[in-house]
């Protein structure tokens, strides 16, 4: 993921199609990321965090469809799906184990690593979207800028709550008991948020 951050620093789109193309690729990769994160937390028996990523997967899937339809309706062209690199959130050797094999020590370490990966992912996404928005503004593509700026604000809000969660978990040194105690409230919170999934398509 650090590799992706470095690539974003050098990213220089030539036109609107380049901008929407790289966002399209990032969104597809994000769906893969949240899908694996949901599987990871489900395997760890942390159903609240699992549902959090399931919600992000479904919400961002709708967001992705909206972006593709926006580009087609306003630019009259299809966005090609570029080659996508795997995200590899779940260690390869985990696939040979049963979820009952997970020890408290492994669970604690896995949660800490996953939260760090999640934060790094969203920071990278925000950085990319902000750069794309800046190019569109410089080109005076205001309608396109507004569309991408919606994505910037969405990921910025996601980061706000994620950073609070990371600080909360760090303050208790990723206590297994504390993490377990959060699961019911997170499960119910995102169960309710599932009802609100929907985006405006123009």
Q: In which residue ranges do the predicted regions lie?
A:
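Iron-associated oxidoreductase/ferritin-like identity signal
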Residues: 1-202
């Amino acid at each position: 993921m650090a590799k992706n951050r470095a690539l974003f620093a050098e990213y220089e789109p030539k036109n609107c199609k380049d901008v929407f193309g790289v966002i399209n690729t990032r969104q597809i990769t994000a769906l893969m990321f949240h899908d694996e994160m949901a599987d990871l937390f489900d395997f760890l028996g942390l159903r609240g965090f699992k549902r959090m990523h399931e919600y992000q997967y479904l919400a961002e899937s709708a967001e992705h469809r909206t972006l593709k339809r926006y580009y087609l309706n306003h630019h009259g062209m299809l966005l090609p799906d570029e080659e996508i690199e795997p995200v590899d959130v779940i260690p390869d050797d985990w696939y040979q184990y049963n979820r009952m094999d997970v020890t408290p020590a492994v669970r604690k370490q896995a949660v800490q690593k996953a939260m760090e990966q999640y934060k790094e992912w969203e920071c990278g996404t925000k950085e990319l979207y902000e750069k794309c928005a800046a190019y569109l503004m410089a080109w005076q593509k205001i309608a396109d800028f507004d569309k991408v700026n919606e994505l910037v604000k969405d990921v910025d809000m996601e980061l706000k709550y994620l950073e609070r969660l990371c600080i909360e978990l760090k303050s208790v040194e990723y206590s297994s008991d504390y993490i377990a105690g959060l699961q019911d409230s997170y499960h119910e919170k995102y169960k309710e948020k599932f009802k609100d999934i929907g985006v405006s398509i123009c």
